Amino acid sequence: MQQIIISGSVAFLVSIFLTPILIRYFTNRQMGQEIREEGLQSHLRKRGTPTMGGIAIIAGITIGYLVTNIYSYFAGYGSFTASGLLVLGLMLGLGATGFADDFIKLYKERNLGLNKTAKLISQLAIALVFGLLVLRFPDENGLTPASTHLSFIRDIDTIDIAFGGGVLGTIVFLIFIYVVVSAWSNAVNITDGLDGLAAGATAFVMGAYTLIAFWQFRNSCDTAVEAGCYTVRDPLDIAVLAAGGLGATLGFLWWNAAPAKIFMGDTGSLALGGLVAGISVVSRTELLMVIIGALFVIEVASVAIQIAVFKTRGKRVFRMAPIHHHFEAVGWAETTVVVRFWLIAIMAVIAGMAVFYGDWLTLAEV
């Protein structure tokens, strides 16, 4: 528990104090967000607001993780783990992609950054490296950071994504990892359209996974093989990362809440999406994340529906997509949309936590 508190606290402090420094830096250099003319007119007032605030989030999570593991080493609790470092690397890689995208937008002074091909190749390369490495580094019990089985609350033994191994199985597994990484990184990116929306929603998810990973640690099959125990390689280090994500997003939210003084940009949204994806893989809860992160799923689904219906029927289901802009277009105030979407995110987290704990209770009683 000490490690979790340290990680969350350090991440929060780094984020909340670094963000205003970034605000001053970008403001003094007149480096601000460009807003599309064809978008909502109410958003034009945000033109020039500093962006790339995700730097503070990434710094908070990274420093919180490093400080915690250095403390753990000297306290005799162990130190860095393969699972934690791989997820951190995934987050940093996608954050770098987002940074390049944001930098190009600011340099060219238009709301278009990396082209789709460059962003796709970057996400693909990062996901493939992550996918190849998560099946390596077995611990003393033979557990690797991830398994080839599809996971809900724990591995589903009857569904082996890699078909037992081989070249074809490896390719299928890597495709699966790419889909997970791409889906969550783009989902958070799409959700980041209103002041505080993505930061708040991600904070709820990270809070849930701090509890989930800590519960997996307390009931690990490594310490006691009993009904309901979890075969997760490094649950405590996963909880440390999730706590860092919680602290960093809350620290950033202090400045990003409406009216936002700074935006996280693609630097932050892609990094946080990578964190969400990575944690779901190494905690072996990919399908559970769909419930806990349901708000992000709704946002992506609204875009997919809008595009599909428009291309097939030439009509629009929503005034604008993603769906948070639809509600703005029909007259909801931005803060109203954000708070109500936060409530949806909270309900999704509660539902996911209930399913997770219910599974443990069911097995523990057997």
Swiss-Prot record:
GO terms for cellular component: plasma membrane. It is found in: Cell membrane. Its EC number is 2.7.8.13. Pathway: Cell wall biogenesis; peptidoglycan biosynthesis. GO terms for molecular function: metal ion binding; phospho-N-acetylmuramoyl-pentapeptide-transferase activity; UDP-N-acetylmuramoyl-L-alanyl-D-glutamyl-meso-2,6-diaminopimelyl-D-alanyl-D-alanine:undecaprenyl-phosphate transferase activity. Belongs to the glycosyltransferase 4 family. MraY subfamily. Its cofactor is Mg(2+). Catalyzes the initial step of the lipid cycle reactions in the biosynthesis of the cell wall peptidoglycan: transfers peptidoglycan precursor phospho-MurNAc-pentapeptide from UDP-MurNAc-pentapeptide onto the lipid carrier undecaprenyl phosphate, yielding undecaprenyl-pyrophosphoryl-MurNAc-pentapeptide, known as lipid I. It catalyses: UDP-N-acetyl-alpha-D-muramoyl-L-alanyl-gamma-D-glutamyl-meso-2,6-diaminopimeloyl-D-alanyl-D-alanine + di-trans,octa-cis-undecaprenyl phosphate = di-trans,octa-cis-undecaprenyl diphospho-N-acetyl-alpha-D-muramoyl-L-alanyl-D-glutamyl-meso-2,6-diaminopimeloyl-D-alanyl-D-alanine + UMP. The chain crosses the membrane at residues 3-23, 55-75, 80-100, 118-138, 161-181, 197-217, 238-258, 262-282, 290-310, 341-361. It is a multi-pass membrane protein. Disulfide bonds: none annotated. This is Phospho-N-acetylmuramoyl-pentapeptide-transferase. It holds the Pfam family Glycos_transf_4. Its main location: membrane. Signal peptide: none annotated. GO terms for biological process: cell division; cell wall organization; peptidoglycan biosynthetic process; regulation of cell shape. Keywords: Cell cycle, Cell division, Cell membrane, Cell shape, Cell wall biogenesis/degradation, Magnesium, Membrane, Metal-binding, Peptidoglycan synthesis, Transferase, Transmembrane, Transmembrane helix.
